[in-house]
UniProtKB/Swiss-Prot annotation:
Enzyme Commission designation: 6.1.1.4
GO MF terms held by the record: aminoacyl-tRNA deacylase activity; ATP binding; leucine-tRNA ligase activity
Family matches, as Pfam families: Anticodon_1, tRNA-synt_1, tRNA-synt_1_2, tRNA-synt_1g
Name of the encoding gene: leuS
Record's keyword terms, sorted: Aminoacyl-tRNA synthetase, ATP-binding, Cytoplasm, Ligase, Nucleotide-binding, Protein biosynthesis
Positions of ATP binding: 625
Protein name: Leucine--tRNA ligase
Any one GO BP annotation for this protein: leucyl-tRNA aminoacylation
Chief site of localization: cytoplasm
Phylogenetic placement of the source organism: Bacteria, Pseudomonadati, Pseudomonadota, Gammaproteobacteria, Cellvibrionales
Taxonomic source organism: Cellvibrio japonicus (strain Ueda107)
Length: 864
């Protein structure tokens, strides 16, 4: 056996073996229990980062462990390849998005192989290829035929100079990222899928997911946002054009008697009508259109409004109330109109304070406390006051009474509402799957028939950064159907479409007769283990659940949910440093910083390695390009090997917690692997083991054997139930320490016990460090590779102890430890304990008052 561990050589050999034997390619096997393990597939940005490495290492470890459990494991990989970054990169590098994307997938595939991930590459998917997106196009036409797809006017970010639609991330401080023009909110026709038809099922089925993090389920519940409220009609005092009333939805009808004004969204039809004859209002509405509609921004921005001059009538009292247009009311929630109760809603309160509008208290705390409305709104539920016949009612009673009054007057009804909006899938970009609809010359549109699919996206294009090449090319739009001229839709799909069903296509990636091969899908689905970041908790995971239900209702898949168990891995963090210049933070790569630390390793001061300038500590934050604190996985692999990177990422923290990158931690992982190598080398050089005779072992060998099987027991639980791989690694490290203490290695029995311990350690570590364990397994003379071995089996008899360690205390403080026979009598334990030299030291000159003995655990001598 080679004396020194050479990671590059060991890893190349293992990877070559897996490639030649197609070790990870699988097919359906009805006679075998399946396990489908999946990591969220990456966007092919060009290079793997440490976040990718952590995600895919976790998934690979789980997949390999399940393989060793004897299961038929599907562990695929592919590329979420459409999207705006490819367009931006193509412009920057003067190339076509397709060429840039395919070049990146080639490079990243090699990086993934270099890390030893056991993917079934025969199932590789690339979502920008027609053989993938053609089925998405087909499915969209089916949804259209079922009435689940519709087109409506929708507001977008419009760049008036570039004459194009901008994604939210392309709007920087209200201006277009490229032109610098003030961005407008503009209405254009867009395609939507009716996710709201499935809102109730999406909400209820979260209860079918016991193995999902509660945090993710809560986020989805809040996003779906089911609420019970009252929809009511406010009549206008005088008609406004064709409008005689408008509807309002509220979840707090108990506050209705405190309404002092109502607010309309800038896009409300009544506001638009009034703006035609009111230039000041038209200007205010135009200003609203350039503001952000992101919830976080809406919450903190200044509340602004304009009195329209018209009045609405309170639905119960008939009193006239002012109608305002306000920038904090959104058209796409409820009805685009809200009743304003400044005393009991903070946004309404701030607005009323600014514009000197009435504030009427109608809710009082249930405990009779007084409230100070000069400071803030009282937003809790309570008891009604100043509300006429409803005074004294609590929230529930008031809800029912007011609902009853309005229903009898035909002015309102109880309604369940959802915060969830229908999914807008149109994007006015080029690099996406074309939406399969034809526009007819006489108006209207029809779905592209199956025989004309796929609608191909041209890949050889020139990007000008302004308009989508397919929108700019009049020839691309032209098509014919049954001899009639039609025009293709030039919008493309939201890229969340591709990632909403890829998990199902992995079960049959080369199936040409349809979107999904149901037999294959029924064998493999649901995904048993899904791994990905919590940032995908809402959109991707909600859309995937929705798509699964759509595919189920089309007869393509079975079951209600796509992912059985979800693990959201934590972020990879690292130290960050910057130099402040002209109020701006210029981030510095850690390798260019000289750091002074205290004896506990904490930061004291730092300076730039080259310039000597003082450098500030930016904290331990998420690795990112913008903060210059990323670590290139390739450089670490080149220095230490892939197994070291894998071991460190699994050992540094439990998978769902943040991991702090540490060079010394990486060095420690490398050191452990070298120790493991040396332990096996030393064992081989010591001679040939005999056949293990467990019944006749001396005590030290029994102890090592017990440690081996305790480790198997613990590590099996850590891998399977707990998924705490860091503690599994720690347990194997302990086992290796115990193995190194074995003094009797000269006889075949001693070597047999050591062999059992080393082979167990190798198999237990094999999912985490697959290259070195494969090399060591073969060096020990075993046939096959660890991946194909059964998981180590626990020998319960080896756990039985003849002796046990008992702690000895004097007055509750640890003063010694003794080895005693299991279940030794109390008197014997007491006798042995007081004879310990260190214990006697603490008993000099004192009187023993009593001795407390806990069998098999502890002796505590109480003395004074």
């Amino acid at each position: 056996m080679q004396e020194q561990y050479n990671p590059a050589e060991v890893e190349a050999q293992a990877q070559q073996y897996w490639e030649e034997h197609q070790s990870f390619n699988v097919i359906e096997d009805p006679g075998k229990e399946k396990f489908y393990c999946l990591a969220m597939f990456p966007y092919p940005s060009g290079k793997l980062h440490m976040g990718h490495v952590r995600n895919y290492t976790i998934t690979d470890v789980i997949a390999r462990y399940q393989r060793m459990q004897g299961k038929n494991v599907l562990h695929p990989m592919g590329w979420d390849a459409f999207g705006l970054p490819a367009e931006n990169a193509a412009l920057k590098h003067n190339t076509a998005p397709a060429k840039w994307t395919y070049s990146n997938t080639d490079h990243m595939r090699n990086q993934l192989k270099q890390l030893g991930f056991g993917f079934d590459w025969s199932r590789e998917l690339t979502t920008c290829k027609p053989e993938y997106y053609q089925w998405e196009q087909w499915f969209f036409t089916r949804l259209y035929e079922k009435g689940l797809v519709y087109k409506k006017m929708s507001t977008v970010n419009w760049d008036p100079i570039d004459q194009t639609v901008l994604a939210n991330e392309q709007v920087i401080d209200g201006r277009g990222w490229r032109s610098g023009a003030l961005v407008e909110r503009k209405e254009i026709p867009q395609w939507f899928i009716k996710i709201t038809d499935y809102a109730e099922e999406l909400l209820n089925d979260l209860d079918k997911l016991p193995n999902w993090p509660e945090q993710v389920k809560t986020m989805q519940r809040n996003w779906i946002g089911k609420s019970r409220g009252l929809e009511m009609r406010f009549d206008l005092q005088s008609p406004v054009g064709e409008f005689t009333s408008f509807d309002i939805y509220t979840t707090r009808p108990d506050t209705l008697m405190g309404v002092t004004y109502v607010s309309l969204a800038a896009e409300h039809p009544i506001a638009k009508y009034l703006a035609d004859s009111n230039p000041a209002l038209a200007q205010f509405i135009a200003d609203c259109k350039v503001q952000s509609v992101a919830e976080a921004d809406m919450a903190t921005m200044e509340k602004k409004g304009m009195d329209t001059g018209i009045k609405a009538l309170h639905p119960i009292t008939g009193e006239p109330v002012a109608v305002w247009v306000a920038n904090y009311v959104l058209m796409d929630y409820g009805s685009g109109a809200v009743m304003a109760v400044p005393a009991h809603d903070q946004r309404d309160y701030e607005f009323a304070q600014k514009y000197h509008l009435g504030i009427t208290q109608v809710i009082a705390p249930q405990n009779g406390e007084t409230i100070d409305l000069s400071q803030a709104a009282f937003t809790d539920k309570g008891v009604l006051v100043n509300s006429g016949e409803y005074d004294g009612l609590d929230f529930n009673a008031a809800f029912d009474a007011i609902a009853s009054t309005l229903e009898m007057a035909n002015k309102g009804r109880v309604k369940t509402n959802y915060r969830l909006r229908d999914w807008g899938v149109s994007r006015q970009r080029y690099w996406g799957a074309p939406i399969p609809m034809f526009n007819l010359p006489e108006g209207g549109e029809i779905p592209v028939p199956a025989h004309k699919l796929p609608i191909l996206l041209p890949e050889e294009v020139v990007m000008n950064g302004v308009q989508s090449p397919i929108k700019a090319d009049p020839e691309w739009k032209k098509d014919e159907l049954d001899g009639q001229y039609v025009e293709r839709e030039t919008d493309t799909f939201d890229t969340f479409m591709e990632s909403s069903w890829y998990y199902a296509r992995y079960t049959c990636p080369n199936f040409t007769d349809g979107m999904i091969n149901k037999a294959a899908a029924d064998y493999w689905l649901p995904v048993d283990q899904y791994v990905g970041g919590i940032e995908h908790a809402i959109l991707h995971l909600l859309y995937s659940r929705f798509f699964h239900k759509l595919m189920r209702d089309e007869g393509l898949v079975s079951g209600d949910e796509p992912f059985e168990r979800l693990l959201c891995q934590g972020m990879v963090n690292a130290e960050s440093f910057f130099i402040k210049s002209e109020g701006k933070e210029n981030w510095i790569e850690p390798e260019n910083v000289v750091i002074e630390r205290d004896d506990k390793g904490r930061f004291i001061a730092a300076k730039h390695k080259i310039t000597g300038d003082a450098v500030e500590f930016g904290g331990v934050i998420k690795m990112s390009k913008s903060k210059a604190n990323g670590v290139d996985p390739e450089s670490v692999i080149n220095q230490y090997g892939a197994d070291t990177v894998r071991l460190f990422t699994m050992f540094a923290a439990p998978p769902e917690q943040s991991l702090e990158w540490s060079d010394s931690g990486v060095e420690g992982a490398s050191r452990f692997l070298r120790r493991l190598w040396k332990a096996v080398e030393g064992h081989i050089n010591a001679g040939t083991p005999g056949k293990l005779d467990a019944a006749s072992l001396p005590q030290q060998q029994k102890d090592l054997r017990r440690k081996t099987h305790e480790t198997i027991q613990k590590v099996s639980d850590d891998y399977g139930r707990r998924q705490t791989f860091n503690t599994a690694i720690a347990a194997v490290m302990e086992l290796l320490n115990e193995t190194s203490k074995l003094s009797d290695r000269a006889n075949p029995q001693g070597l047999a016990v050591e062999r059992e311990a080393l082979e167990a350690a190798i198999l237990l570590l094999a999912p985490i460090v697959p290259h070195i364990t494969q090399a060591l397994w073969i060096e020990l003379g075993n046939s096959g590779i660890p991946l194909n071995q059964p998981w180590p089996t626990l020998d319960e008899s080896a756990l039985v102890r003849s002796t046990i360690e008992v702690v000895v205390q004097v007055n509750g403080k640890l003063r010694g430890k003794i080895d005693a026979a299991v279940d030794a009598p109390k008197e014997l334990l007491e006798q042995i304990a007081v004879q310990q030299e260190n214990v006697q030291k603490f008993l000099e000159g004192v009187t023993v008052r009593k001795v407390i003995v806990v069998p098999n655990k502890l002796v505590n001598i109480v003395a004074n």
